Design a protein with these regions (language model features):
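A late C-terminal transmembrane helix in Major Facilitator Superfamily
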Residues: 341-374
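Extracytoplasmic gate region of multi-pass secondary transporters
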Residues: 35-36, 222-263, 270-273
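Helix-loop-helix hairpin linking two adjacent transmembrane segments in secondary transporters
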Residues: 144-194
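Cytoplasmic membrane-interface "Motif A"-like loop-to-helix N-cap segments
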Residues: 77-87, 281-293
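C-terminal transmembrane helical hairpin of 12-TM major facilitator-type secondary transporters
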Residues: 284-333
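Conserved MFS/SLC helix-loop-helix module at the cytosolic interface between two early adjacent transmembrane helices
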Residues: 66-102
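Cytoplasmic helix-loop-helix junction between adjacent transmembrane helices
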Residues: 110-148
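Juxtamembrane intracellular "pre-TM" segments in multi-pass secondary transporters
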Residues: 3-11, 196-225
Length: 409
């Protein structure tokens, strides 16, 4: 059986559609990271504790886990153009509502709303790419759009406190409202450029029972394995993104130095996302996955044995290479599983992100628990290395399962 990439003709205007998806994902990153640099101001203004603020910051992820699968089903039935626009509206409404929050519960509800819009964007983006790109172009397109959240997060972190807070008279609510309107603008841009999206495999008819579609996706053994692998990938990515500064500080770096060093894997990750996914075609995909998981493994081990020594920069580079492309290549593999394709990419993407966010929440929590028990990060880094090793081992059965489906070449 030939891969889907050999069956679909390139679609005119696909790069404009990719630009629209990137804008949506960038707005996703803006609003996802928008609270972090404003936490001290919000806590002081609303009179809430660190513990309460922690529940606010995690509210959208909790909702996201349960909303991702229904959102994926909506994507396949509604179509990407309308569904992604609704995602942008929900994210924009979340940002604007945060800006008007006057107490803890209002802020909590506003942030939770992001968990309803976010899955439409994150599950819809790979569906748009699978509908419009083929072969190496598909990998490149996925690598490009996946940089959007990182760019949005960096813009939020770099501009909120140094530029926007002084410019807006120290009113943190106006900053959050600005990010909300950025999401609405991205939604309008997508509505303009997203016209004409087609699905050559045919849409799922609204009359088709939902459980049939869910069962059809989960009945595929490669999909089930990829969902398990997604938990491991998000455990590593979210653990490192949330704890890296503290890990470096624990190893002896000052807070300013640790913050600067933490930029290294972020920059390397962008380069990785723009280069490696386009190589992950056909049977080469498995070699790329093993390489990425190996980079994560050796990065964690170098942190363990090297600390702030001469191996530090190599460890940061390896973690950046892995973090920039692991998720992208895994999603690329998912949407090309026979029985998924463009037709069920939204549903499969919903399952992917629902499962993955279990690791996204659990990874950082596990690191915090291990640190609290030992007073250091050695056991936590050993756990991340073990997860990477398990991911390497999972590539072999994944290749065998896909070969049985006629995908491996």
């Amino acid at each position: 059986m030939q891969g889907l990439s050999t069956q679909i003709e390139p679609i005119p205007g696909r790069w404009w559609k990719l630009a629209g998806v990137w804008a949506l994902y960038m707005a996703f990153g803006l609003n996802m990271a928008g609270l972090a640099p404003l936490v001290p101001d919000i806590e002081a203004d609303l009179g809430i504790s660190h513990a309460s603020m922690g529940t606010v910051l995690g509210a959208w992820q909790f909702i996201y886990i349960f909303a991702a699968i229904p959102c994926g089903l909506v994507l396949d039935r509604m179509g990407t153009r309308r569904a992604l626009f609704w995602g942008a509206l929900l994210i924009g409404a979340s940002g604007i509502a945060r800006g008007f929050a006057q107490e803890y519960l209002h802020l909590l509800a506003a942030v939770a709303l992001f968990g309803l819009g976010g899955p439409l964007i994150s599950a819809g983006a790979p569906k748009v790419v699978s509908e419009n790109f083929t072969g190496a172009e598909r990998g490149l397109a996925m690598g490009i759009y996946i940089t959007g959240p990182g760019v949005g997060a960096m813009v939020s972190l770099l501009f909120s406190q140094p530029v926007l807070m002084p410019l807006l008279g120290g009113r943190w609510g106006l900053v959050l409202i600005l990010w909300g309107f950025a999401a609405l603008a991205a939604g309008l841009f997508w509505l303009l450029v997203g016209r004409g999206v087609t699905r050559s495999a045919g849409p799922i008819t609204p009359s088709a029972p939902l459980w049939n579609e869910i069962g059809a996706v989960l009945s595929l053994a490669p999909v089930r394995l990829i969902l398990l692998m997604s938990i491991g990938v998000f455990s590593i990515n979210h653990a490192m993104s949330n704890w890296l500064v503290e890990v470096l500080h624990n190893f002896g770096a000052g807070l300013k130095q640790a913050s600067l060093l933490a930029v290294v894997p972020a920059v390397v990750g962008i380069v990785s996302a723009l280069t490696l996914p386009r190589l992950a075609t056909g049977s080469r995909r498995f070699g790329v996955l093993i390489t990425l998981f190996s980079c994560s493994l050796f990065g964690s081990l170098l942190f363990l044995i090297g600390g702030m020594g001469s191996w530090l920069y190599l460890a940061l580079i390896l973690m950046g290479i892995a973090g920039g492309s692991m998720m992208t290549v895994l999603i690329l593999t998912l949407v090309e599983v026979p029985g998924v394709g463009e037709r069920r990419a939204g549903t499969a993407g919903g399952f992917f992100f629902s499962a993955a966010e279990i690791g996204g929440v659990g990874g950082p929590v596990a690191i915090g628990v291990l640190y609290g028990g030992s007073g250091g990060f050695s056991s936590a880094l050993a756990l991340l290395a073990l997860v990477a090793l398990l991911l390497i081992g999972a590539v072999v059965p994944l290749r065998r399962l896909l070969a049985g489906s006629g995908k491996a070449q």
